[in-house]
Amino acid sequence: MTTSAASWRSDPADPSVASARERALRQRSEGRVRITASAFGGVTRLTDLAEGGALRARLPRGGPGLEAVIVNTAGGVACGDVFSIEAKAGPGAHLTVATPAAEKVYRSDGLCADIQVRLVAEAGARLDWLPQETILFDRARLRRRYEIDLSATASFLSFEALMLGRLAHGDAMGEGHLEDHWRLRRDGALIFADALRLAGPMGALLARPAVAGGNRALATLLYVAPDAEARLEEARALLDAARCEAGASAWNGLLCVRLLAPDIETLRRDATSFLMAFRNAPLPRVWAT
C-alpha cells in the first residue's frame, strides 16, 4: 500500500513523532546547479546551465566577466538537505559565483545537511568563489565538501565565512556539528587539503585558544595564482587595519588568509575592505543589498 506524506503524518498506528531519519528523508530539500562560462574574443559568456530542485542561478548584468548568483529557494538549509554546486571557467574565462544573502543552517533533529561544491578553472581562467556568510543555528548539523581543480595558469580566489550562533538575536550555538573538507589540485596534483570538524558543545570548543579563543565568526580566504606568493606582503599590509584577528601565509603558489572575530559584523567589515583592495574590483552587487 502506498502511503502519502499527509497520511503518514496522521496514521494513528504510527508513533506520534517519527524518527529523525524518517522525518528528514520525507521533508528534506535537494538542489543542483551547474554553470559553465567560456571566453569568446575576450568576453565571457554562459555556455552551460543546469538547475534542479531548490537551487537556481541568476545572472545579473554588468561588471567584469560573468557573475552568477546561486539562490536557494528553500529559504535555508535544514537537516537531511542535499545540495550540489558545480562551476567551471573555461580557458581565458572570468567567472564570479556569489549568493544573494547569508545562508542559514537551521536546527537539526539528527541528520547532517550535505553541501558539495566542485569548482574548475582551466588555462588562463579566473574563478572567484564569493558566497556570503553561513550562519549556523543552535543544534545545526552541516557537512560541506569542496573539490577544486585548477590549471597551473588559472587564477582562483575563494572566501568562506561562518557565524556560529546568532548573537544579534541573543542565540548562542550551544550544541552542533560542523565539518568542512577542502581538496585543491593544480594540474592534477594536490596542493591544499584542509579539514575542520567541530562537534558537541560548541561554546566550550570555540573558547579553546587553539580553536577560536572565544570568537564566534571565522573565515578563510584562498588565493591560488602564479603571483600568489609574491602578494603575501601586500595581503599582510591590508590586514594591518583589521579589527579582527587575522593572519596570512603563502607557499607553493597559494596564499591563505584566516580571520577570527567575536561577531559577523566585524568580520564582514574587515573582509569586505580586504577583498575590494586585494581584488582591485568591487564585490558582487548582491553583497551590498
Curated annotation (Swiss-Prot):
The keyword Cytoplasm applies. The gene is ureD. Its main location: cytoplasm. This is Urease accessory protein UreD. One of its GO terms (molecular function) is nickel cation binding. HAMAP family: UreD. Keywords: Chaperone, Cytoplasm, Nickel. Required for maturation of urease via the functional incorporation of the urease nickel metallocenter. It is found in: Cytoplasm. Belongs to the UreD family. Pfam families: UreD. GO terms for cellular component: cytoplasm.
